[in-house]
Amino acid sequence: MATLKIKKGDTVQIITGKDRGLKGKVIRAYPEQNKVLVEGANRITRHTRVQQGTRGSQSGGIITQEAPIHVSNVMIVDPSDGKPTRIGYRINDDGTKVRVSRRTGTEL
């Protein structure tokens, strides 16, 4: 299984689906499922049952939250010009491996 090139905190753009064109920050990455959770994208509605809390508090009702999106449906946004780009890797002179933009060559 290949490693996930998109990390938590990256800004990505949705390239297909109902939220196409939307830009958002990656909240969480799920490498074992090849999915990412993007802030404000792929919102779903959950109906939760009322649960009795220990102190008499009740929580329940309709909740909207983000659902994971497959990494093939998002592209990372190049920080230099704000356009979506593919990701490559480069090894610096000191031996560290860094992610770079394929379009502009800038480090991500």
Curated annotation (Swiss-Prot):
Entry-linked PANTHER family: MITOCHONDRIAL RIBOSOMAL PROTEIN L24 (PTHR12903)
Q: Which organism is it from?
A: Frankia casuarinae (strain DSM 45818 / CECT 9043 / HFP020203 / CcI3)
Record keyword RNA-binding present = yes
Oligomer and partners: Part of the 50S ribosomal subunit.
Q: Give the UniProt keywords, A-Z.
A: Ribonucleoprotein, Ribosomal protein, RNA-binding, rRNA-binding
Tell me the lineage of the source organism: Bacteria, Bacillati, Actinomycetota, Actinomycetes, Frankiales
Q: Which InterPro entries does the UniProt record give?
A: KOW (IPR005824), Rib_uL2_dom2 (IPR014722), Ribosomal_uL24 (IPR003256), Ribosomal_uL24_CS (IPR005825), Ribosomal_uL24_KOW (IPR041988), Translation_prot_SH3-like_sf (IPR008991)
Q: Which GO terms describe its biological process?
A: translation
Disulphide linkage map: none
This protein's name: Large ribosomal subunit protein uL24
Family the entry assigns? Belongs to the universal ribosomal protein uL24 family.
Mind telling me which Pfam families this protein's record contains?
A: KOW, ribosomal_L24
The protein's role, per its UniProt record: One of two assembly initiator proteins, it binds directly to the 5'-end of the 23S rRNA, where it nucleates assembly of the 50S subunit. One of the proteins that surrounds the polypeptide exit tunnel on the outside of the subunit.
Q: Which GO terms describe its cellular component?
A: ribonucleoprotein complex; ribosome
Q: Which GO terms describe its molecular function?
A: rRNA binding; structural constituent of ribosome
